[in-house]
């Protein structure tokens, strides 16, 4: 038993993170070589460099401001050692991705779309920041009330969707593989609001292990960018470039966020990540690719919903109910089953990479 414990303690996320970063960089350079008009590597490399340096500079400042994460005591006991690790790291890197991504195009329509995506992403970053700050000042693992946070998220999403609707940026159909379309007409608007709320909270739930959300997010942004370039005239190089800038900012952050993490993104980063993914998917008619490629985010969210629903449905007079998972979200289920965090995270990255490849094979034409 002690040998297994010693072996686990020697594991860290250095090599898996290096492999992931190298794979994304390689994919960008290959795409630039093979796909006409592809310039994915430039925003990617710029964002990786800047976010790496800014996070390196910012972590000591977050620590000096006493922005240490409060760890919930009912979670995996191995996480208690992470208490005090600086959080709100999204504040350091989200603006990097947004600014570099916003410089990708100055053409009228594209520039306006990039501005709209940047604003809704930053709005969600601020909402997450308020939530994180509230948690830190109360010294608990909870910040804003769920209803209050959801209301703020919905307000920011509605403002974005109102702008997009006024400009005619969102079609009333969802493009599917094999030249199929799902006509939704006015139903696209409640679906779009649902996508914002569901995706941002799914990325938030995924941010529970060192490097998990940042690695998965970088892969999904890369996948969205690649499928946009593969769609030819139906794609959008400007939005693809924005995606690569966001992928780069999370890869730069991952260098400091991989196990053992020196900093956490907090709701500041995870909510912004989900908002950016949602906005890009809606403006580029990429809801289907996002659904496939973001399968890990979906699974994490569904695991929580199922856990809560089954527990409430089976709760007896003693207040106890059945649990489908050892603990939700899903990554904690594997942890409590004996799989170390240092193994769970690369496995979830690998699943996401597989889903990205599946999404590229089944992207809309």
Curated annotation (Swiss-Prot):
It is an enzyme of class 2 (transferase). Its cofactor is Mg(2+). Catalyzes the initial step of the lipid cycle reactions in the biosynthesis of the cell wall peptidoglycan: transfers peptidoglycan precursor phospho-MurNAc-pentapeptide from UDP-MurNAc-pentapeptide onto the lipid carrier undecaprenyl phosphate, yielding undecaprenyl-pyrophosphoryl-MurNAc-pentapeptide, known as lipid I. InterPro entries: Glycosyl_transferase_4 (IPR000715), PNAcMuramoyl-5peptid_Trfase (IPR003524), PNAcMuramoyl-5peptid_Trfase_CS (IPR018480). It is found in: Cell inner membrane. One of its GO terms (cellular component) is plasma membrane. NCBIfam families: mraY. HAMAP family: MraY. The chain crosses the membrane at residues 15-35, 39-59, 84-104, 114-134, 156-176, 178-198, 209-229, 235-255, 263-283, 291-311, 343-363. It is a multi-pass membrane protein. GO terms for molecular function: metal ion binding; phospho-N-acetylmuramoyl-pentapeptide-transferase activity; UDP-N-acetylmuramoyl-L-alanyl-D-glutamyl-meso-2,6-diaminopimelyl-D-alanyl-D-alanine:undecaprenyl-phosphate transferase activity. This is Phospho-N-acetylmuramoyl-pentapeptide-transferase.
